[in-house]
Each structure stands twice: as structure tokens, then as C-alpha cells.
């Protein structure tokens, strides 16, 4: 039972770290202002455009 408990605690910690890293990555733009902001904005804009285009195509069909 001890082994299972340890494995569960480790898996939970890994998931928490991954979630924190994602949220922190968005907030830690202060470290690399120009690079991270330009990349993030371009990716977000592309994603929004694709979503809008998909919605329009569905309505037309």
C-alpha cells in the first residue's frame, strides 16, 4: 500500500507542476518581454482566426 500511496502523490505533484508551469509561463513574460509577447500574440491571433473561420463555414453549410 505504501508504494501505491507514494506513486499517487508523485503523479499528483507532477500534474500540479505542469499546471503551474503553464500558468506561470503566461505570467513570466516579464523575463523575456519582446520575444514571449510577440510569439504569444501571433499564436493567439492565429487560433482565433481559425476558430472564427470554422464557425462561419459551419453556418454556411
From Swiss-Prot:
Gene name of the encoded protein: PRM1
Task of the protein: Protamines substitute for histones in the chromatin of sperm during the haploid phase of spermatogenesis. They compact sperm DNA into a highly condensed, stable and inactive complex.
MF terms in GO: DNA binding
InterPro entries membership: Protamine_P1
Protein family (similarity comment): Belongs to the protamine P1 family.
One GO location term (cellular component): nucleus
Keyword DNA-binding: yes
Disordered: annotated segments: 1-61
Protein name stated in the entry: Sperm protamine P1
Record's subcellular location: Nucleus; Chromosome
